[in-house]
Amino acid sequence: MSAHCMLTGARPGFGNRISHSHRRTSRRFDPNIQTKRYWLPSENRHVRLRLSTKGIRTVDSIGVEAAVARIRARGVRI
């Protein structure tokens, strides 16, 4: 599965791992993706969302209905 947030669109960042002697090798900074299950009252069912921790706080703030509407507006099928 891809490491990106369905709500915020957070994706991995890239950079360098730097050793003590300053040799550089590529590395990935993955977002903290969590799978959360929310109850969607309008559809009378649960939905499983892959969200970053910032996305989880956004759902807590705006509500699951508005969050699902934003995700669907991005073209993601739930």
From Swiss-Prot:
Keyword S-adenosyl-L-methionine in record: no
Source organism, top-level taxon: Bacteria
Cellular component terms (Gene Ontology): ribonucleoprotein complex; ribosome
InterPro entries reported in the protein's UniProt record: Ribosomal_bL28, Ribosomal_bL28/bL31-like_sf, Ribosomal_bL28_bact-type, Ribosomal_bL28_sf
GO biological process, one term: translation
Disulfide cysteine pairs (residue numbers): none
Keyword annotations: Ribonucleoprotein, Ribosomal protein
HAMAP family referenced in this protein's UniProt entry, alphabetically: Ribosomal_bL28
Family note: Belongs to the bacterial ribosomal protein bL28 family.
Protein name, UniProt field: Large ribosomal subunit protein bL28B
Species: Streptomyces coelicolor (strain ATCC BAA-471 / A3(2) / M145)
